[in-house]
Amino acid sequence: RSLKEVKDQSRIFGQVFLTYIEENAQILWEDVSESASDAVAGLLKQSQAKQGEQTESVSLDQIPEYSDSPYVEINGNVPSFSDEKSAGPAYEFYSELDSLGRCGYAESKITPELMPDEERGAIGMVKPTGWHTVKYENVDGRYLYNRCHLIGYQLTGENANKKNLITGTRYLNVTGMLPFENEVADYVHSTGNPCMYRVTPFFKGDELVARGVEMEAESVKDQKISFHVFVYNIQPGIEIDYTTGNSWEE
């Protein structure tokens, strides 16, 4: 099958079934017949598990202040994916934007078939909440902000998907998130095994720029990949107004 066909199917599982079933999980689970497909039955259970996982997520108040490291381990560095999700089909899911236009969590069961085989296209047309085009001499590459993929392009081939892009500092994108993305990508490429992956942006109140992102991953077959971290959306030497995205040198 082509990459487009695989992604279309994964989106059906992730964006149609999971969204619809999340709203009707209990009723559907009680009424589902023995003749229901294993995939649909599994998704029903996945949705129920997902609801529990999301409500148990760490809160921003529990995250320590930034202190020289781009990330901090949370929940004992243990991810919280359900067995039902891990055993289910490949999928990708991107939350709807909230009333302020902000991204919610993005999640996928990453497989080699979902990973792109072509270079990333243009994404400059997407303006995530809090976006400003601003340069500083003391920032690598000079641009303070990047359009940060929640699920990196190399993992699911999502390009200019506004549900998957947030305003993130160069430090968040390259120093913080990229090493974890590369770890997952290298594992899936080298083994062919699937890996669960979820990234959740953390916004404080009505702020338009996320304070950071929660990243979780777990390889399904051997647990060689397993992490649960919070990556800070900061830039050393730069102060950020997270309400507006405005910034200035310290």
Indicate residue ranges for each PLM-predicted region.
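N-terminal, intrinsically disordered, polar/charged segments of Gram-positive cell-envelope systems
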Residues: 2-83
